[in-house]
């Protein structure tokens, strides 16, 4: 295991009370969260979302991405189901960090798309490590999930890491004029499954 469970507390939200569980990476001391709703211990596949940190979208209401919209929709769906969990994967900006994300935004303002901007800064299109999320699921005793995602790479990596993705559930929300090019680029260059809804 790459991380350990270190703390937990109730988290009241507009959608109901979640159990917030804090994890710490053993090698780096970086922290991550799980938000658990209801009983996730049965063997039935659990509704789940792996949500990568996005300060600008999640906390600052940015329209440049769909992250904040996805976070709210996922928590709402989990609460409506009365059972599920959201992993808050703290790898900001597809794991290039907040300051580099701002630099990437500046390049996008000059005409680069989200993938090209990462490359111009010396990064891959996506630097995230989803094997950490597989370990979080395992620590929580969750081995079979119904995953809220548009990203088939998440499905593949979690599956290879021993998590059964019984179903992929699209999470297509929040498109607007500010993020349309970003979403189109994720579909065209990163394989995200978005166009059934938008085209």
UniProtKB/Swiss-Prot annotation:
Binding site for Zn(2+): 54, 65, 67
Free-text remark on how the cofactor is bound: Binds 1 zinc ion per subunit.
Pfam families in UniProt: GTP_cyclohydro2 (PF00925)
Catalytic residue positions: 126 (proton acceptor), 128 (nucleophile)
Reaction catalyzed: GTP + 4 H2O = 2,5-diamino-6-hydroxy-4-(5-phosphoribosylamino)-pyrimidine + formate + 2 phosphate + 3 H(+)
CDD domains: GTP_cyclohydro2 (cd00641)
UniProt entry keywords in alphabetical sequence: GTP-binding, Hydrolase, Metal-binding, Nucleotide-binding, Riboflavin biosynthesis, Zinc
Entry's Gene Ontology BP terms: riboflavin biosynthetic process
Molecular functions per Gene Ontology: GTP binding; GTP cyclohydrolase II activity; zinc ion binding
Task performed by this protein: Catalyzes the conversion of GTP to 2,5-diamino-6-ribosylamino-4(3H)-pyrimidinone 5'-phosphate (DARP), formate and pyrophosphate.
NCBIfam families: PRK00393.1 (NF001591), ribA (TIGR00505)
Family, similarity comment: Belongs to the GTP cyclohydrolase II family.
Protein name: GTP cyclohydrolase-2
């Amino acid at each position: 295991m790459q991380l350990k469970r270190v703390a937990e507390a109730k988290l009241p939200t507009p959608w109901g009370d979640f159990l917030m569980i804090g994890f710490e990476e053993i090698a780096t001391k970086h922290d991550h969260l799980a938000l658990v709703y209801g009983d996730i211990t049965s063997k039935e596949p659990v509704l789940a979302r792996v949500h990568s940190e996005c300060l600008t979208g999640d906390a600052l209401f940015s329209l440049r991405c769909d992250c904040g919209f996805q976070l709210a929709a996922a928590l709402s769906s989990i609460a409506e189901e009365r059972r599920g969990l959201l992993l808050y994967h703290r790898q900001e900006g597809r794991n290039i960090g907040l300051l580099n994300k701002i630099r990437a935004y500046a390049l996008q303002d000059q005409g680069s798309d989200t993938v090209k901007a990462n490359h111009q800064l010396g990064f891959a299109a996506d630097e995230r490590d989803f094997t950490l999320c597989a370990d979080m699921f395992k620590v929580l005793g969750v081995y079979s999930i119904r995953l809220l995602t548009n990203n088939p790479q998440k499905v593949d990596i979690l599956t290879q890491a021993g998590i059964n993705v019984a179903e992929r559930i699209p999470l297509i929300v929040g498109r607007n004029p500010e993020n349309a090019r970003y979403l189109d680029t994720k579909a065209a260059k990163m394989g995200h499954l978005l166009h059934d809804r938008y085209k």
